[in-house]
Amino acid sequence: MASNQGPCGGIITMEKYIIAAVADNMAIGRDNELLWHISADMKYFRMVTMGCPIIMGYKTWLSIGRPLPGRKNIVITKSHFDAPESVVQVPDVAAALAAAAIPPADAPAPEKCFITGGAKTYERTIASADKLYITHVRTSVPDADAFFPAIDPAVWYKESESSLETDPENGLQYSFAVYVRKA
């Protein structure tokens, strides 16, 4: 959990969640693009992350190309880039978590933030994440160049998983799972 000083001096804690769509071989991307388009997964991502700060690496920002509405967009980057004023640019994960914990004006501190990619950002944050929201896409992508870290069953408990569904546009099967860090 990230923490921040509250207005009365108390510590505010914020849970860190990771969200990703992952192939059976843990592939998540190729040439800085997603490997598939699954409408239900895009809707799920929007529903789960709406209203929460989202943290992403610069390459993920480039692949999206715009701020995602209804969420504080925080981009980890070593170099400042042209972006709308609403996009928060930070140099590292620690600064991203600190920025995520700052509440919007006249609002309570966020209870959670989502790490939305890419591979390097997932690698740097999985050891301290509290939950994983994983869309398991039942395919293997041998020519992928970006991968999600292994989900170690000694560390993660699968709290829930939806039934397997099939995308009507591309025939890919997928399910939504939530993993919780074991105590």
Residue map of PLM features:
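Short hydrophobic transmembrane-like helices used for membrane targeting/insertion
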Residues: 11-12, 102
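Extreme N-terminal starter segment of soluble prokaryotic enzymes
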Residues: 13-17
